[in-house]
UniProtKB/Swiss-Prot annotation:
<comment type="function">
    <text>Provides the cells with the ability to utilize trehalose at high osmolarity by splitting it into glucose molecules that can subsequently be taken up by the phosphotransferase-mediated uptake system.</text>
</comment>
<feature type="binding site">
    <location>
        <begin position="294"/>
        <end position="296"/>
    </location>
    <ligand>
        <name>substrate</name>
    </ligand>
</feature>
<feature type="binding site">
    <location>
        <position position="327"/>
    </location>
    <ligand>
        <name>substrate</name>
    </ligand>
</feature>
<dbReference type="GO" id="GO:0004555">
    <property type="term" value="F:alpha,alpha-trehalase activity"/>
</dbReference>
<dbReference type="InterPro" id="IPR012341">
    <property type="entry name" value="6hp_glycosidase-like_sf"/>
</dbReference>
<dbReference type="InterPro" id="IPR008928">
    <property type="entry name" value="6-hairpin_glycosidase_sf"/>
</dbReference>
<dbReference type="GO" id="GO:0071474">
    <property type="term" value="P:cellular hyperosmotic response"/>
</dbReference>
<keyword id="KW-0326">Glycosidase</keyword>
<keyword id="KW-0574">Periplasm</keyword>
<feature type="binding site">
    <location>
        <begin position="222"/>
        <end position="224"/>
    </location>
    <ligand>
        <name>substrate</name>
    </ligand>
</feature>
<protein>
    <recommendedName>
        <fullName>Periplasmic trehalase</fullName>
        <ecNumber>3.2.1.28</ecNumber>
    </recommendedName>
</protein>
<feature type="active site" description="Proton donor/acceptor">
    <location>
        <position position="329"/>
    </location>
</feature>
<feature type="active site" description="Proton donor/acceptor">
    <location>
        <position position="511"/>
    </location>
</feature>
<keyword id="KW-0378">Hydrolase</keyword>
<feature type="binding site">
    <location>
        <position position="213"/>
    </location>
    <ligand>
        <name>substrate</name>
    </ligand>
</feature>
<feature type="signal peptide">
    <location>
        <begin position="1"/>
        <end position="38"/>
    </location>
</feature>
<feature type="binding site">
    <location>
        <position position="169"/>
    </location>
    <ligand>
        <name>substrate</name>
    </ligand>
</feature>
Length: 568
């Protein structure tokens, strides 16, 4: 993907090769993957060079693409970008240009004649009298996909091993979703599948230089919250410590991706994902290589940019894309006025969750290097310590919680969000900061159905009143690490009760939950509520293991709804 021009304050120099990277006075040239260790092929992985990646749908057939998205032929803007062109997209687009002004031209019929539709993931052909845990175990095969080869012109990226998709409209693997899914796979005894998913992500790093948002061409310009080191840690718990050495090359490449472009930054400048603060501290932000509307949400993005009268549309598009990379798409955390999407400024924010995850990556790299007996262990440990110091200096609010920092205005957020618990999850918080954060979270975010994402009602899906499975697990695991078992149990049991109540009523697990007493699915966002659902399944199994209350594991009431056959 081409790099877009820099905005003011961004030092967008050409990216240096990973071997030439330097940071905080420490030369990484000795221990970034291409220099230190040859990336040996993983067992069973596809090692031949992949076919050239086709252009994204908005570039492959631009006029047709815009006509379909602008005309709202489908309720969900993602639907069309997942369609398979039945012949050369350039020829399809040329035919569209030649025909679309003719009398009687029918755009929908033209699309139907030239594309194959991708159906949603079906998960409703499971017996209606299964208990929750049994239902989840039965769901895994429904969510598994194997795509070692893809048809020409598809937006899907091939992967060497089977993988689990979230469900519904999400027909591909997603980066940060997959960690929480893998937790459940391991708990279900599906350790081979969990290992295969980890190997898929290692393959993506080796092939594309990073783990994209998902295995689609239109996701390649960005990543998602970097959970690869947590996946390696999870697999080490299954196979043993040798796992760290096996994935060291990919861990190093992952780190190089997130730190790329940070060379020679002056205080107050940013490049790609890297920000150098006014005091010289180096932290990270979310970012995307492209500054155009997201193909999977094209109409939403163009309308949002049109409402931002005082900003270049390209800036709005990049901030929307960066918000998608954050996983929190969207939330008041990224909005200048705290409520209006057109004020989004994601790239101006140094997020507490992202930097906690990168601290864990640095610590994992130090551990992996220690297994090789190389000096890079001390170097990565030093980088982790410097990041911790920068987090304590800039992302700790004296009111008693971790928060996001706006590097452009040099202001710390006064908003308590579920992201405040990531430093506990990563193990970087001091005992005092952990205790004070727990107190703040209990006072501001505890709800009848679990942990609220934020305390603001904006209509965005990563705000009040929604609760999300991954954030419940980050909270529960992080709080337990620091002895806050009571609050952890309260959050975990309340969320389990919410999951069980909706399951008993509708026999499904969903992407997000409302946290009110009525135990409904969550709302807001750019698309309808999805069921399946990968990360909810995984977190539910983890919570059931910790808090196995009878009400959370009994079978739901029988329903008269007749199950439909599964899609092929």
């Amino acid at each position: 993907m081409p790099h877009a021009p820099a905005r003011s304050g961004d030092a967008m120099s050409a990216a240096a090769p990973p071997c030439c990277t330097s940071l905080l006075g420490l030369s990484l040239s000795m221990f970034v993957a291409p220099c230190a260790l040859a990336a040996t092929p993983l067992e069973g992985a596809v090692v031949s060079a992949p076919a050239p990646t086709p252009p994204t749908p908005d570039l492959a057939y631009p006029e047709l693409f815009q006509a379909v998205q602008r005309g709202e032929l489908f309720d969900d803007q993602k639907h069309f970008v997942d369609f398979l062109p039945l012949r050369d997209p350039a020829l399809i687009n040329a035919d569209y240009l030649a025909q679309h002004e003719h009398a009687g031209f029918d755009l929908r019929k033209f699309v139907d004649a030239n594309f194959e539709e991708s159906p949603p993931v079906q998960t409703d052909a499971i017996r209606q009298d299964t208990a929750l845990r049994e239902h989840i175990d039965a769901l895994w095969p429904k969510l598994v996909r194997s795509q070692t080869n893809v048809p020409a012109h598809s937006s899907l990226l091939a992967l060497p091993h089977p993988y689990v998709v979230p469900g519904g409209r999400f027909r591909e693997v997603y980066y940060w979703d997959s960690y929480f899914t893998m937790l459940g796979l391991v708990k279900s005894g599906e350790t081979t599948l969990s290992r295969q998913m980890l190997d898929n992500f290692a393959y993506l790093i080796d092939t594309y230089g990073h783990i994209p948002n998902g295995n689609r061409t239109y996701y390649l310009s960005r990543s998602q919250p970097p959970f690869f080191s947590y996946m390696v840690e999870l697999q080490a718990g299954v196979e043993g410590e040798a796992v760290y050495q096996r994935y060291l090359p990919q861990l190093q490449k992952e780190y190089a991706y997130w730190m790329q472009g940070g060379d020679d930054l002056q205080p107050g400048q940013a490049a790609r994902h890297v920000v150098r603060l006014a005091d010289g501290s180096v932290l990270n932000r979310y970012w995307d290589e492209r500054d155009t509307p997201r193909p999977e949400a094209w109409l939403h993005d163009t309308r949002t940019a049109a409402e931002a009268h005082d900003r270049p549309a390209a800036d709005v598009y990049r901030d929307l894309r960066a918000g998608a990379e954050s996983g929190w798409d969207y939330t008041s955390r990224w909005l200048a006025d705290g409520k209006t999407l057109s004020t989004i400024r994601t790239t101006a924010i140094v997020p507490i969750d992202l930097n906690s995850l990168l601290y864990h990556l640095e610590r994992t790299l130090a551990q992996a290097c220690a297994h090789t007996g190389t000096a890079c262990s001390q170097d990565y440990a030093a980088l982790a310590q410097q990041r911790k110091q920068a987090i304590d200096a800039h992302l700790w609010n004296a009111a008693g919680y971790y928060a996001d920092y706006d590097w452009q205005t040099r202001t710390l957020s006064n908003q308590v969000t579920a992201a405040a618990l990531y430093p506990l999850f990563a193990g970087l918080a001091s005992a005092d900061h952990a205790k004070r954060t727990a107190t703040s979270v209990r006072a501001r975010l505890l709800r009848p159905g679990g942990l609220a994402t934020t305390a603001l009602k904006t209509g965005q899906q990563w705000d009040e009143p929604n609760g999300w499975a991954p954030l419940q697990w980050v909270a529960v695991d992080g709080l337990r690490r620091y002895g806050e078992d009571g609050l952890a149990r309260t959050i975990g049991e309340r969320f389990l009760t919410q999951v069980q109540a909706l399951f008993a009523r509708e026999h499904k697990l969903v992407e997000k939950y409302g946290l009110d007493a009525d135990a409904a699915g969550g709302g807001g966002g750019e698309y309808a509520l999805q069921d399946g659902f990968g990360w909810t399944n995984g977190v539910t199994l983890m919570l059931l293991n910790l808090y196995p209350s009878p009400g959370a594991i009994q079978a739901p009431a029988k329903t008269k709804r007749k199950p439909e056959p599964a899609a092929p």
